């Protein structure tokens, strides 16, 4: 028993055992985890009295009264309790055994290799993305732009041919530019088409966390804490740990009061007034759908108005919830999109334009939903088919293909939510459709856990795997513990358990078999021991910024594959945890090494091979100065075989 809660538990236990008490009301959170907390307390207290279940999503006085007027029979909740206990115990058994197995087999003294059903597949998402970025080979391309003029009007177009607007050769782009320069364009297509954009759905916790990260840079945990305070202490929003983005029909009658509360915020007052003046709120299945509400409905404001004296984080989160709640009742944003094709000397140019007919819900988001004003197509002048427009200007622009971006916290939350798409089996993919990796309530803690154990680093809004995290995923290989498929199979069976078609004993028996195989798998694997993240200024996880490769690669046991010959002594160069180094360092003391992180950029095996073979790489992007500014440079070996940066303007 936790010392901090022992006294409180004694009070609860005493009340449960009081002869005057004939029934116990379970008022824990309405959901799987709330059911679990109550079950543990009930069993620990040795209580056997009948249980009634309070099932509510708001802590306002009115909501609590309504909940007590419709208490559920606790016996109906037994399947939910079984599923909750099974999930909790299975996670504990798998995590404890897998962590110990891999820590003993591959960890160094004092360095635990934490492994878990949710955190490990999440880490693999980031490591796989990092590998994609490292293996990506940028390719240059060229695009031709033209400006067309007629009287006082102009518009711009981009060259295209068969849906392709990029040219792989500069000479070809310049030839097209020269061909159309000074020519006259004829409009062969001028099509106008009306389009609309529906308002975004109400918030569940994951979407709220993603939006707060994109707009304010909040971590998922920071958003959850603010939302929890708004729910528990301020009573301004409904239950935040929800996975639903819809409301139930029985809530429709009370929505106007919530509009009044949301509209009490000065910046939202005009929008609240507009909805109230219209009379009846427009209700659609994008707002109210009983089939898409399970334990809890979407996060919305309560009917309590804010006093206006909220802490900064809570103020921002409350604004997000209130703004989204009002936005769903506004009409679609409507546009008139224009597509124009202009032909010049057998070459075609595409132009797109847009006119906003009705901002609709977008009026609540003048700076965009994510806090960044989206670049809209320009308003084109009047253009008709058959018109001739002079080519006033032609330009050739060079571009380069870009690797997939690293995960921001917002993007990772989205990937965890939709992790089922990485599962090949259709039935299992469907089982994960409404769950993903973790739950809305636990995803923030999973990310923080990955950081605290040294698997991830947070660089502003970006999450980057450490060497330790990469090493673990490499060791695990195709183990089921690193795949979302394990969660898919669990969720499929736990859902059946909630409905009485799966037994808890069968599920836990299979978990035991799985754990035994997992431990045997760890014992049979071969690989190097994993070092803890490097320390700098007393902190773990700091990245090396050195370009000098003279420090040697003796920090780790080398892997067997040779990347090339050591330029100092001719021995094979192999990869270690932190460097590509001479394999003969122990015998001969050769200290040649190419560090895997140089000025904030990871050096891939392919780049190390190029450096060994040619003495330099091509220009590479992704380096960072001490001030955090990105720059490009090549890596080269100097006369003493040390790695240094070479810039374009160097001789």
Describe each model-derived feature in a short phrase:
Residues 268-292, 481-522:
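Leucine-rich, amphipathic alpha-helical/linker segments
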Residues 617-618, 622:
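Short, surface-exposed polybasic-aromatic patches that bind anionic ligands, especially phosphate groups
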Residues 563, 579, 587:
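Residues immediately within or flanking Cys/His clusters that coordinate Zn2+
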Residues 566-569, 582:
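Short cysteine-rich clusters marking metal-coordination/redox-active sites
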Residues 337-342, 347, 624-649:
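Short, cationic/aromatic linear interface patches
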Residues 588-614, 645:
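Short metal-binding segments enriched for Cys and/or His
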Residues 1-420, 425-437, 441-448, 452-455, ...:
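Toprim catalytic domain recognition across nucleic-acid enzymes
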Residues 552-563, 571-576:
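Short, flexible, mixed-charge glycine/proline-rich loop motifs
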């Amino acid at each position: 028993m936790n010392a901090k809660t022992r006294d409180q538990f004694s009070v609860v236990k005493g009340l449960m055992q009081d002869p005057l008490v004939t029934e116990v009301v379970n008022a824990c959170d309405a959901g799987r985890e709330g059911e679990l907390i109550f079950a543990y307390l009930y069993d620990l207290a040795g209580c056997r009295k009948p249980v009634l279940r309070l099932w509510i999503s708001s802590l306002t006085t009115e909501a609590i009264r309504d909940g007590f007027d419709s208490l559920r029979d606790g016996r109906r909740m037994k399947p939910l309790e079984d599923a909750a206990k099974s999930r909790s115990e299975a996670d504990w058994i798998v995590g404890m055994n897998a962590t110990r197995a891999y820590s003993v087999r591959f960890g160094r003294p004092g360095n635990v290799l934490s492994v878990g059903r949710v955190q490990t597949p999440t880490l693999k998402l980031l490591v796989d993305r990092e590998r994609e970025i490292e293996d990506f080979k940028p390719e240059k391309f060229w695009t031709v732009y033209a400006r067309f003029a007629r009287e006082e009007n102009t518009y711009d177009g981009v060259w295209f041919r068969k849906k392709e607007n990029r040219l792989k050769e500069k000479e070809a782009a310049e030839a097209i530019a020269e061909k159309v320069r000074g020519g006259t364009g004829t409009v062969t297509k001028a099509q106008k088409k009306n389009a609309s954009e529906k308002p975004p759905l109400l918030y569940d916790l994951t979407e709220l966390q993603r939006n707060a990260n994109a707009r304010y840079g909040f971590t998922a945990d920071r958003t959850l804490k603010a939302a929890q305070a708004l729910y528990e202490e301020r009573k301004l929003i409904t239950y935040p740990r929800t996975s639903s983005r819809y409301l139930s029909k029985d809530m429709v009658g009370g929505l106007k009061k919530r509009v009044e509360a949301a509209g009490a915020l000065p910046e939202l007052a005009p929008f609240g007034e507009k909805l109230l003046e219209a009379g009846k709120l427009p209700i659609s299945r994008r707002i109210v759908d009983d089939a898409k509400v399970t334990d809890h409905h979407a996060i919305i404001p309560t009917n309590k108005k804010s006093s206006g004296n909220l802490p900064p984080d809570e103020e921002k989160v409350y604004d997000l919830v209130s703004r989204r709640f009002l936005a769903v009742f506004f009409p679609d944003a409507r546009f008139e999109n224009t597509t124009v094709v202009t032909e010049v000397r057998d070459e075609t140019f595409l132009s797109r334009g847009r006119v906003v007919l009705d901002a609709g819900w977008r009026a609540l988001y003048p700076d965009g939903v994510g806090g960044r004003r989206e670049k809209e197509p320009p308003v084109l002048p009047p253009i008709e088919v058959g018109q001739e427009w002079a080519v006033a200007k032609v330009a050739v622009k060079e571009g380069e293909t870009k690797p997939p971006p690293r995960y921001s916290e917002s993007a990772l939350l989205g990937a965890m939510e939709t992790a089922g798409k990485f599962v090949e089996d259709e039935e299992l993919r469907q089982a994960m459709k409404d769950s993903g990796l973790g739950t809305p309530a636990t995803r923030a803690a999973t990310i923080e856990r990955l950081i605290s154990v040294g698997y991830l680093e947070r660089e502003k809004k970006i999450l980057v795997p450490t060497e330790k995290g990469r090493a673990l995923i490499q060791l695990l290989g195709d183990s089921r513990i690193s795949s979302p498929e394990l969660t898919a199979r669990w969720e499929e069976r736990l859902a059946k358990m909630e409905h009485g078609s799966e037994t808890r004993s069968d599920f836990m028996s299979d978990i035991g078999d799985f754990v035994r195989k997992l431990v045997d798998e760890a014992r049979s694997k071969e690989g190097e021991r994993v070092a803890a993240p490097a320390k700098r200024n007393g902190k773990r996880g700091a990245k090396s910024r050195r370009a000098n490769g003279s420090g040697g690669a003796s920090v780790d046991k080398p892997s067997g594959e040779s990347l090339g010959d050591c330029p100092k002594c001719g021995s094979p160069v192999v990869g270690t945890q932190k460097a590509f180094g001479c394999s003969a360092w122990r015998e001969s003391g050769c200290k040649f090494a190419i560090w895997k992180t140089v000025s904030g950029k990871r050096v891939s095996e392919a780049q190390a091979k190029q450096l060994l073979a040619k003495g330099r790489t091509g220009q590479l992007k992704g380096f960072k100065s001490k001030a955090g500014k990105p720059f490009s440079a090549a890596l080269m070996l100097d006369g003493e075989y040390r790695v240094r940066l070479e810039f374009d303007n160097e001789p």
